[in-house]
Regions:
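Glycan-recognition and catalytic cores of secretory/periplasmic carbohydrate-active enzymes
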Residues: 1-402
Length: 402
């Protein structure tokens, strides 16, 4: 986002009559963050989980279709975002499957409706469009790879073949975009080659056992991509070509760093290949140490792991999820447990402390902290809340991850 667009968001934000109170509440949170974290009440994490789920359901039911949108304080709701709708579905079904949560039934219903909508908007080529629906973009590899996560969750939950068939079409289209060197070199976001394709490969590997005839070929293609990604990793575990912009690719955001590391770790587990897990754990531990030492992460990190820009809670939640996986895989990874628990408290504080109680905003996690940071400025991106509730369910041992 350029300086002009950034200043325009500030102006639009303050034109709303009640946004001064949001601003001062946020400033108060920044000033007294240490105290908020220290005195976060018992039961607050579970409250944050329930309220986050309620907001995700609202993000689906408030619009004209049954996709999930993003809310901006300065401009309201966007059109639906197929990619994030896809990976919100597993979160809703995981919450619903115990039947214990106050919004369990509504979560299940919203997940089914979102899944049916995604089936309707799947392209003839097998992919799904990038970006928000009003942008009318072509099919995109990364976005399609996230929607097959939702298709898998629905298939496991219902056993209905329509979700499996949809995923197969999508996966075949994704592999058509992989070149001989292992890069997704066509039909990906910005037309740029990026390493966070690991987060596309991982759900394909999770699907592979359900497609016995394709399994070996898919695993070979997955290894081709993952091996290329490892060529982009430095000795200090930092990853080149990891940002979702062109002009800041030298200092990627923790959101896309976490995508890449999580994809590597899951792929390593599914393929039983240690080198991918080691690559993921290395980067995850660097960021865990920085977080524990400082109490907060920067939003971006350059090749020396020097940070800049405001904290991006989405990336924090994603890292907490990865730290949880690492801790579950290795009981000696005490650093991962400490970082995960501290991050989940921080996310709960950010999401619940302050003036946001209205239905469009209550319970949601913001794009940046403070909310006027450069990432999703004054926004409540649905993917931030999705990852927060996933991480809180891990922390609370809510149910097994699907």
């Amino acid at each position: 986002m350029g300086a002009l667009a950034y200043s325009q968001r500030w102006a639009a934000f303050f034109k709303k009559y009640d946004h001064w109170r949001y601003f001062f509440a946020e400033w108060n949170k920044v000033v007294y963050l240490k105290s908020y974290r220290k005195h976060h009440p018992v039961g607050a994490l579970e409250k944050s989980l329930h309220h986050g789920i309620r907001w995700l359901i609202h993000s689906i039911t408030q619009g004209p279709d049954r996709g999930s949108g993003t809310y901006y304080h300065h401009s309201g709701w966007t059109s639906s975002y197929p990619e994030t709708t896809g990976y919100i579905i597993p979160s809703l079904l995981r919450y619903a499957q115990t039947g214990d949560g106050p919004w369990a039934e509504s979560a299940e219903s919203a997940a089914f409706e979102a899944g049916n909508w995604l089936l309707e908007v799947q392209r003839n080529d097998g992919g799904w469009p990038g970006g928000y629906m009003h942008q009318h973009r072509d099919s995109v590899v990364f976005n399609t790879g996230q929607i097959i996560r939702g298709m898998r969750a629905l298939y496991l939950y219902t056993g209905e073949e329509v979700y499996k068939q949809s995923a197969h079409r999508a996966i075949e289209w994704i592999w058509d975009q992989l070149d001989a060197e292992g890069k997704f070199s066509s039909n990906d976001f910005m037309g740029a080659v990026r390493v966070y394709g690991t987060y596309v490969v991982a759900p394909i590997l999770a699907w592979a056992p359900h497609f016995e005839a394709d399994k070996d070929v898919w695993e070979a293609k997955a290894r081709l991509h993952l091996d290329w990604v490892l060529t982009q990793q430095q000795e200090n575990f930092w990853l080149a070509n990891c940002d979702n912009t062109l002009h800041k690719n030298h200092k990627p955001i923790i959101h896309t760093i976490a995508y890449t590391l999580d994809g590597l770790f899951d792929a390593g587990c599914l393929l039983k290949e240690a080198k991918y897990k080691i690559a993921a754990i290395g980067g995850a531990e660097v960021l865990a140490q920085k977080f524990v030492e400082r109490g907060l992460l920067h939003g971006r990190y350059d090749k020396q792991w020097c940070g800049s820009e405001a904290f991006i809670p989405t990336g924090g939640a994603q890292l907490a999820i990865l730290w949880n996986k690492i801790a579950a895989d290795d009981s000696h990874s005490f650093w991962a447990v400490e970082a995960r628990s501290s991050m989940n408290t921080l996310l709960s504080v950010i999401a619940t402390s302050g003036a946001r109680t209205a239905r469009d905003v209550g319970g949601a996690l913001q794009g940046s902290f403070p909310m006027w940071g450069r990432y999703e400025t004054f926004g409540l991106p649905n993917w931030a809340t999705k990852y927060m509730v996933d991480s809180l369910m891990n922390e609370l041992n809510w149910s097994d991850e699907r």
